[in-house]
Amino acid sequence: SAGAPNKGLLRIDVSTPNIGWGPVETVSTNTYVCGSDTMYNFFPPPGFLCPDGSYPKRLIKQKTYNKVGNTFQNTERDAGWMVYHPSHGHIHIEGWGLYTLRLRDVTVADTLQWPVVNSGIKTSFCLIDLTTCSGSLGDCVDSVGNILNNASFPNYGLAGGYNCGNVTQGISVGRVDIYSRSLDESFVKIPYEA
């Protein structure tokens, strides 16, 4: 109802920390897709829409950095698509996350094997240096569950200054991007039967 817009929704915060050795960086290309049509070296005018009324998808590349001697070298690989998100006013990375609400089964140790009650999908996400591992304790955790802070990273802050740009986005070493529960699509619907 209009008075209870979150009724029946399990709202969630999602964090994406960079606990690696180098920046996580994406760079957009000038390759766009509208339905089954691919447009190369395309520079769409402001407000451009596909024939079906949707926004075009823009191919992105992920840059991976390596230190060779005293210089950085990088390689690029295809990494999915960006799409314009009208309620936020900028481009996001498509298909960032899938959230599932599951029924606990005490006879099954692997939680991914528990029955799915419902799911939600985050159709887009922006990569940005929103906070630090020290500023968001508990969001940066290593593979054995140790909580990491800024001092845990010898390359802390490497790169830096990423924002939600239309060409380059990223997360610096020791930084965290957080997608708040108050934003679009940050929920899983709880079925009436549950």
Q: What is the meaning of each model-derived region?
A:
Residues 4-8, 91-93, 184-190:
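Solvent-exposed loop and beta-edge segments used for protein-protein assembly and interaction
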Residues 1-33:
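Boundary/junction segments of secreted and surface-exposed precursor proteins
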Residues 99-101:
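Conserved aromatic beta-strand anchor motif in extracellular beta-sandwich/beta-rich domains
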Residues 26-97, 120:
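Short coil-to-beta strand junction motifs in C2/discoidin
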Residues 96-97, 107-193:
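Exoplasmic/lumenal beta-rich domain surfaces
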